[in-house]
Amino acid sequence: MFGFHKPKMYRSIEGCCICRAKSSSSRFTDSKRYEKDFQSCFGLHETRSGDICNACVLLVKRWKKLPAGSKKNWNHVVDARAGPSLKTTLKPKKVKTLSGNRMKSNQISKLQKEFKRHNSDAHSTTSSASPAQSPCYSNQSDEGSDTEMASSSNRTPVFSFLDLTYWKRQKICCGIIYKGRFGEVLIDTHLFKPCCSSKKAAAEKPEEQGPAPLPISTQEW
């Protein structure tokens, strides 16, 4: 394979008399042939002479092709490259990659710690939200279970695989459920606990009774 070919650069001690560039990829030429057009082409009020770069020569040739009566000029090019060379001004600053890698590793470690802390919190809330409790004996125990379920549901993070634009989170008497658009229900066993009211309603449901028996007459004939 061919190696990288570095383009040849031409330099001028005085620099271009128009843009003041001291280096160019093309040769510098004498400005005597173009000095008569400097005033109209570049909007100069003084005479300039010396070397001229190829870019400024092309601007003069372009100005000559303008239609008659055109007032366009390239005054913004005058002394545009005066001062430090183009190579030094466009040289990018070296970034310390070591410090950047350290910052990335610190951020990753912080994210890992936070993720572990969230997992531990979720585990503690799920373990406290589903204890083996006896049936409700008083209103006070009902209120305690409701507050416990509410606190655990608030602290438990939402599962990442749920599309919250489709599943809507709803709080009912038995805990937290996720309901879809067409009536389907998604239940998380850690956040759902049948309450006493539903159990009592199921137990107190009257059984279906058969037809009433006919009265038996005891009168003798």
From Swiss-Prot:
Organism encoding this protein: Mus musculus (Mouse)
Name of the protein described by the UniProt record: SIN3-HDAC complex-associated factor
Renumbered residue ranges of the record's region Disordered: 110-153, 201-221
Biased composition (Low complexity): 124-135
One of the protein's GO biological processes: negative regulation of transforming growth factor beta receptor signaling pathway
PANTHER family the record matches: SIN3-HDAC COMPLEX-ASSOCIATED FACTOR
GO cellular component: nucleus; Sin3-type complex
Biased segments, Basic and acidic residues type: 111-121
Function, as annotated: Subunit of the Sin3 deacetylase complex (Sin3/HDAC), this subunit is important for the repression of genes encoding components of the TGF-beta signaling pathway. Core component of a SIN3A complex (composed of at least SINHCAF, SIN3A, HDAC1, SAP30, RBBP4, OGT and TET1) present in embryonic stem (ES) cells. Promotes the stability of SIN3A and its presence on chromatin and is essential for maintaining the potential of ES cells to proliferate rapidly, while ensuring a short G1-phase of the cell cycle, thereby preventing premature lineage priming.
Record-stated family: Belongs to the SINHCAF family.
Ranges of Polar residues composition bias in the record: 136-153
Subcellular localization(s) per the UniProt record: Nucleus
Record note on quaternary structure: Component of the Sin3/HDAC corepressor complex at least composed of BRMS1, BRMS1L, ING2, SAP30, SAP30L, HDAC1. Found in a complex composed of at least SINHCAF, SIN3A, HDAC1, SAP30, RBBP4, OGT and TET1. Interacts with SIN3A and OGT.
InterPro entries hit by this protein: FAM60A (IPR026065)
